[in-house]
Amino acid sequence: MSKVEAQIEKIFTSFDKDGDGNLSWDEVFSRMSSNSNIKDPLAATKSMFDHYNRDADTENLSIQEIREVLMSKKIKQDLIRTEKALRSKVKDFRKKYDTDNDGVVTFDEMYQLYLKDPDFDEEDDELSAEEREKAKCRRAKSSCRYFFSAVDKDKNDKLSYLEIHEYLKKHPEFDLGPSQ
């Protein structure tokens, strides 16, 4: 049982005075009346029955009815939080890589940032500085090509908001990559 389901069970049990597994109108009204924060217990009881009573049984509320409504709300809230986090990540991605602020991330914009990243530096001491620089350029270009091949669906060497969004949605573990 999840934490949310345990909380639902606890609240339900506090309403279910006769312990029959259902909430009668009287049980709900009694509980609403005993809460000093509720100014109109009759309206609150009616509202609760209107909101949670999903079957033809208008006399009682089952824990299953309440659980279904609350869990569907929780799922919706989780989806909203996930979408907000995803939008924030897309915004951060564009802020980092869309260096000319034209609304798309080009291959060249990403490549130029990769070239500044020390993670792409070649550390082979036997290579000359020029050879190390060429190796770094090859590695940065290869990484950009690989990323663009996965994300750039229309193959125009530009990443749109939608392309970035769809990729990050499928790959939530994605790290924004090299530091600036």
Swiss-Prot record:
GO biological process terms, alphabetically, are: aggregation involved in sorocarp development
Give the UniProt keywords, A-Z: Calcium, Metal-binding, Repeat
Superkingdom of source: Eukaryota
Please tell me where Ca(2+) 2 binds in this chain. 98, 100, 102, 109
**What Gene3D superfamilies is this protein classified in?**
EF-hand
- Taking the record's annotation, the residue ranges forming a coiled coil are none
Binding positions (Ca(2+) 3): 152, 154, 156, 158, 163
Q: Which Pfam families match?
A: EF-hand_5
- Domain EF-hand as annotated: residue spans: 3-38, 40-76, 85-120, 139-174
- The positions annotated for binding Ca(2+) 1 are 16, 18, 20, 22, 27
Q: Which InterPro entries match?
A: EF-hand-dom_pair (IPR011992), EF_Hand_1_Ca_BS (IPR018247), EF_hand_dom (IPR002048)
> What GO MF terms are annotated?
calcium ion binding
What this protein is called in its record is Calcium-binding protein E
What organism does the UniProt record list as the source? Dictyostelium discoideum
Which gene specifies this protein's sequence?
cbpE
